[in-house]
């Protein structure tokens, strides 16, 4: 995986610089999402590794599947990936691009795992409290994890806040063993 990130980084950096220069970080991010989803599809993976498909055919396939409304710069970016046989790196390129975009915009990703669904008001309050604590804007991704029993577990960057019943029980068990 680290090797993939090393290979993907120059492409992500180039995409970010192009997007920032054009003032189009949002559209590039959406385009990379579509391209990464296409590259991760099993049938598209088979096409990428099929030696019978020419570079032109592969390029046209990706443009047809994910490239509706692409600017000439985005089309050229896809062409570079095809020519350098890097289409399989699109998920990593997208992830690195999002990191660069978030850093540029002063935003961090927050992953919130909850034992039960959070209503919009609760999520908005939690997000506001976290933004105040971390002094940054947050993009939140919420997932359900019934194994938490109750409460939430929040991961922002390298920091994890475990306010779940399962986490408290684990801490209690560790304290009793000592």
From Swiss-Prot:
<comment type="function">
    <text>F(1)F(0) ATP synthase produces ATP from ADP in the presence of a proton or sodium gradient. F-type ATPases consist of two structural domains, F(1) containing the extramembraneous catalytic core and F(0) containing the membrane proton channel, linked together by a central stalk and a peripheral stalk. During catalysis, ATP synthesis in the catalytic domain of F(1) is coupled via a rotary mechanism of the central stalk subunits to proton translocation.</text>
</comment>
<dbReference type="InterPro" id="IPR026015">
    <property type="entry name" value="ATP_synth_OSCP/delta_N_sf"/>
</dbReference>
<dbReference type="Pfam" id="PF00213">
    <property type="entry name" value="OSCP"/>
</dbReference>
<dbReference type="GO" id="GO:0045259">
    <property type="term" value="C:proton-transporting ATP synthase complex"/>
</dbReference>
<dbReference type="GO" id="GO:0046933">
    <property type="term" value="F:proton-transporting ATP synthase activity, rotational mechanism"/>
</dbReference>
<comment type="function">
    <text>This protein is part of the stalk that links CF(0) to CF(1). It either transmits conformational changes from CF(0) to CF(1) or is implicated in proton conduction.</text>
</comment>
<keyword id="KW-0375">Hydrogen ion transport</keyword>
<dbReference type="InterPro" id="IPR000711">
    <property type="entry name" value="ATPase_OSCP/dsu"/>
</dbReference>
<dbReference type="GO" id="GO:0005886">
    <property type="term" value="C:plasma membrane"/>
</dbReference>
<keyword id="KW-0813">Transport</keyword>
<keyword id="KW-0997">Cell inner membrane</keyword>
<protein>
    <recommendedName>
        <fullName>ATP synthase subunit delta</fullName>
    </recommendedName>
</protein>
<keyword id="KW-0139">CF(1)</keyword>
<comment type="similarity">
    <text>Belongs to the ATPase delta chain family.</text>
</comment>
<keyword id="KW-0472">Membrane</keyword>
<keyword id="KW-0066">ATP synthesis</keyword>
<keyword id="KW-1003">Cell membrane</keyword>
<comment type="subunit">
    <text>F-type ATPases have 2 components, F(1) - the catalytic core - and F(0) - the membrane proton channel. F(1) has five subunits: alpha(3), beta(3), gamma(1), delta(1), epsilon(1). F(0) has three main subunits: a(1), b(2) and c(10-14). The alpha and beta chains form an alternating ring which encloses part of the gamma chain. F(1) is attached to F(0) by a central stalk formed by the gamma and epsilon chains, while a peripheral stalk is formed by the delta and b chains.</text>
</comment>
<keyword id="KW-0406">Ion transport</keyword>
């Amino acid at each position: 995986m680290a090797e993939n990130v090393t290979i993907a980084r120059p492409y992500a950096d180039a995409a970010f610089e192009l997007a920032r220069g054009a003032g189009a970080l949002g559209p590039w991010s959406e385009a990379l999402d579509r391209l990464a989803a296409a590259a991760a599809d099993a049938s598209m993976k088979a096409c990428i590794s099929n030696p019978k498909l020419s570079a032109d055919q592969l390029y046209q396939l990706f443009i047809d599947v994910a490239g509706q409304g692409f600017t000439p710069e985005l089309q050229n970016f896809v062409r570079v990936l095809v020519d350098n046989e890097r289409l399989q790196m699109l998920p990593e390129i997208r992830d690195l691009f999002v990191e660069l975009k978030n850093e540029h915009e002063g935003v961090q990703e927050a992953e919130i795992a909850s034992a039960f669904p959070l209503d919009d008001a609760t999520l908005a309050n939690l997000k506001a409290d976290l933004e105040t604590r971390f002094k940054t804007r947050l993009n939140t991704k919420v997932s359900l994890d019934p194994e938490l029993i109750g409460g939430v577990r929040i991961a922002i960057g390298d920091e994890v806040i475990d306010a779940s019943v399962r986490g408290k029980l684990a801490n209690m068990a560790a304290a009793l063993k000592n």
